[in-house]
Amino acid sequence: AFKRACQKAASQTVDLLAPHGYKEPSETRGESAYLIEANDHFLAHVEEGLGTKNLVADLVEKQTGKSFYREIGVDTVATIVNDLVTCGAKPISVAMHAAVGDSNWFSNEVRASSLVNGFAEGCRKAGAVWGGGETPTLRGLVDPNTIVLAGSAIGRISPKSDRIIGDVKSGNAIIFLASSGVQTNGLTLCRQLAESLPQGYGTSIGDGRTYGEALLAASEIYVSFVTECQKRKIKLNYVSHVTGHGWRKLMRLEEPFVYTISNVRQAPALFRFIMEKGPVSLREAYATFNMGVGFAAYVDPSLVEQTLSAAKDSGYDAWLAGHVTKEGSRKAVVIPSLGLTYEGDTLQVR
């Protein structure tokens, strides 16, 4: 309700763009990035938060003495720019917001420098300058032993034809790009599971890594995939950053379609471990976690091979996963091989 109230109030401020020579383009509100239109380009803006992943890093550091804050820095940038690029914008500038409850948090030099280096690494991967930020000390509001990480980014779409507008059509192919692991969503459930394990985050998940190490793998940044497609003039009808809400996020587009996923890879070891030890049902897992899929692209079937080639050449593991069909007003994600269907009313993100 609060989010909808914000969107309603925000929409009533659109007239304030005109004096600056800008306007609001159609179908931008409710998407992952907000666009502002000029004569020959669009500007894009995103604000995003990391979530609770750094709490896992804190507990793993206590157990092992190893800092994973480089990965946390990359994660923070990833969650911002992966949303920004969904509209076709190339990131220009990223800002960090790092709120602590006690300024002594920064006195742990290994942790602090790891965070700085990771954030800078994320910006380099995104092709964006780290433009600044804010490091407030919020005593009484933030726990003195933790940090709340978030940030924002500005991007640009030029030429305007590079905009990804969401013109999905029946028959479009769905291409998946692999994730590095849990990335930045579902961590609350993951932390609850750790509390029930005798060895906690030190528990082996069966692939040579501990539970903590697997959870803290740095997120993939998908900017290079989108920019490579733009360079090759491959039209992306829509893309989705698969974060919160798991595979339900595949139906984020407002227009109703049925998204059938016919090529399902085995879930990576981390997710199999979570399902077994939770236990977490198959239905809850695919509704919560990315299950090995970090990004999805929707393209004309004639462009599948070109899109897969662009993904591979820019360093991503990608595959043809399914297709889109129009079934009247129905919106759903259907995964036949798993016996799973998520109807449109299970996703509320607008």
Spans of model-derived segments:
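Glycine-rich phosphate/pyrophosphate-binding loop regions near the starts of catalytic domains
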Residues: 6-180, 341
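Gly-rich Lys/Arg/Thr-decorated short loops/hinges at beta-loop-alpha junctions or inter-strand turns
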Residues: 53-63, 202-210, 255-258
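Alpha-helical scaffold elements adjacent to nucleotide-binding pockets in ATP/GTP-utilizing enzyme cores
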Residues: 5-6, 189
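Active-site pocket-shaping loop/turn-to-helix segments
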Residues: 66-74, 211-220
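Glycine-/charge-enriched secondary-structure boundary and capping motifs
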Residues: 108-126, 142-147, 208-214, 220-350
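Short, acidic (Asp/Glu-rich) active-site segment that either coordinates a divalent metal cofactor
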Residues: 160-211
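Acidic-glycine-rich active-site phosphate/pyrophosphate-binding loop
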Residues: 41-43, 49-51, 199-201, 264-275
